[in-house]
Amino acid sequence: MPLRCIGCVALLIATAAPACAKELATQPAVSSRLVLSRTERRLAFTGDPIWKLQLQSPGTANLDFDTVTGKAHRQTADRHRSGTRAPLPPGTYSLGPVERLGPRDPVELGPIWIGLEPRFPTGRGHLGIHLDPSANRNSNSGTLGCVGLIHRDEMLKLASLVKRRKVQTLVVLE
């Protein structure tokens, strides 16, 4: 009798497997993404608000990076208007490739650029993720609206992880 039951289970699994495989193939794959959110913290010297950039990947612990976005005194400006120096508008963005910057690129962008393309209508453009080498140091602290990592080693780590985990999405929360 036990032999028959084992055979029935094997038969059941064999006939159900193709249906399960088809069902799994039609479900969207869960992928890594970045999420940017406000914190209550500020940089000690310049007063820039610190935003948390979190890398979320299925099956691994979330990684947090301290960033700035916009200028300290422009945090409440219209986030959809160009030239306001406000933080990124809330919404979903597509990430471009990780690009190394060279000596002819602006020093305030640091060594790496990851372009951002809004997936919603906005007056903002030329946005990206980069190092803010002036963060908490002088009047250049903050960005014109991009996401600026505060620490060089974290920017390099983030760029490596974005490439390795094939991150394609940034979600900016209110």
Model features per residue range: what roles?
Residues M1-G7:
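Bacterial N-terminal signal peptides that target proteins for export
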Residues G7-T15:
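Bacterial N-terminal signal peptides
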Residues A14-E23, E174:
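Polybasic, low-complexity, intrinsically disordered segments
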Residues A19, G145-V147:
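Sequence contexts marking disulfide-bonded cysteines in secreted/extracellular proteins
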Residues C20-S141, D153-E154, K166-Q168:
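Cell wall/extracellular polymer interaction/catalysis modules
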Residues N138-G145, A159:
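A short acidic/glycine-rich loop-to-helix N-cap element
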Residues G148-L161:
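Low-complexity, intrinsically disordered Gly/Pro/Thr-rich segments
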Residues S160-E174:
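A short beta-strand-loop micro-motif that forms or neighbors metal/cofactor-
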